[in-house]
Amino acid sequence: LDEIQMVEEVDNPYLPGNSGSKITFVDVLLGLKGLSNVDVYVTGSNSKMLSSDVATAFRDRGEEIHITPLTYDEFHAAYPKEKRFAWREFVTYGGMPLVMQKSTHGEKSKYLQDLFRLTYIKDVIERNRLRADAETLDELLNVVASAVGSLTNPTRLSNTFRSVKGLKIKNETVSAYLDCFIDAYILGKSYRYDIKGRSYIDTPLKYYFTDIGLRNARLNFRQ
């Protein structure tokens, strides 16, 4: 049920004729606790709660389940067209489930681009109370998207903004922005396995998008 918290209270069906007895969705959820074959899952927008908040808000009372976009195996199993085209579709549009409901390239690309424009960027700014404008975050994501597979770090990215865009953004600020995207499961990062101790500090690493379709959408499917 989407936006369940907006549902108004209703008359208690177990007490007909008693107009003063009302129940809400909370009462319904509490009633499910006594059933042995029912699991209750609560989800929310990035702007409202991230995984880092779960440990605090639901300490010892819940378990986090990290749901990723579809893997290729899952995508292939659900792909409605000829299976020989599944890989090409997957590496182009990724594994966001709703992509599979779109028919044309235009519909799929618009959906993925709108996720950034209307949801992800706004959520990250709102959730983290960032001073950065959406354009700066857009540019950072574009740089990371075009450099997937290349070693980089916040210092190099900061220098890129300064030399190419003429924007002075401290490497600490770039690092903080990247961490926001990682917390929102938009990006991930991979360290070199052969680095030890203090060498980890500012050593180049690789950033990647959790969904290849989202990465391609950042570049308007040019690469």
What positions do the PLM features span?
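Conserved Walker B catalytic segment
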Residues: I4-Y41
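Interdomain motor-coupling "hinge/lid" segment immediately C-terminal to the ATP-binding subdomain
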Residues: N37, S45-S47, S51-L151, T155
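A generic local structural motif
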Residues: V26-L30, S51-S52, D194-I195
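Accessory nucleic acid-recognition modules appended to NTPase machines
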Residues: H105-G106, K110-Q223
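Short, glycine/charged-enriched secondary-structure capping and boundary segments
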Residues: P13-P16, F25-D27, A55-D60, K81, ...
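Short catalytic/ligand-binding loop motif for oxyanion handling, primarily in non-cytosolic enzymes
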Residues: V7-E9, M49-S51, V99, A217-R218
